[in-house]
């Protein structure tokens, strides 16, 4: 019997996959527990529509990330920090501070965990901070650290 998996079933199939399985296994386990539906022409057409919709949504996410990348390349975030002698900062500027400044100054919300700044910013001036906007799209934020 051909079935369309509605959930991942370990060792048998992944969600959205169409597979031939024994009739007893399909009727007594997969269909009964709603792990799969029978592969009728109507269900197959519905599966194709779902795949097409998911592909369009993914494409839209990538386009949105690219638009955000373009926006980020044209702006500058100013972060003030306490400094000591010689322009050295007390502590460092963290990704949390950058995310808060970006939200306050430009009304753009980016998760601090998406910024790649392992040690923080330790000096005054300009720093380019890489940001992972999507699996495929990476941008940079220009951060200007000034004396408080």
UniProtKB/Swiss-Prot annotation:
GO terms for molecular function: rRNA binding; structural constituent of ribosome. GO terms for cellular component: ribonucleoprotein complex; ribosome. This is Large ribosomal subunit protein bL9. Belongs to the bacterial ribosomal protein bL9 family. Binds to the 23S rRNA. PANTHER family: 50S RIBOSOMAL PROTEIN L9 (PTHR21368). It comes from the Bacteria. InterPro entries: Ribosomal_bL9, Ribosomal_bL9/RNase_H1_N, Ribosomal_bL9_bac/chp, Ribosomal_bL9_C, Ribosomal_bL9_C_sf, Ribosomal_bL9_N, Ribosomal_bL9_N_sf. Pfam families: Ribosomal_L9_C, Ribosomal_L9_N. The gene is rplI. Keywords: Ribonucleoprotein, Ribosomal protein, RNA-binding, rRNA-binding.
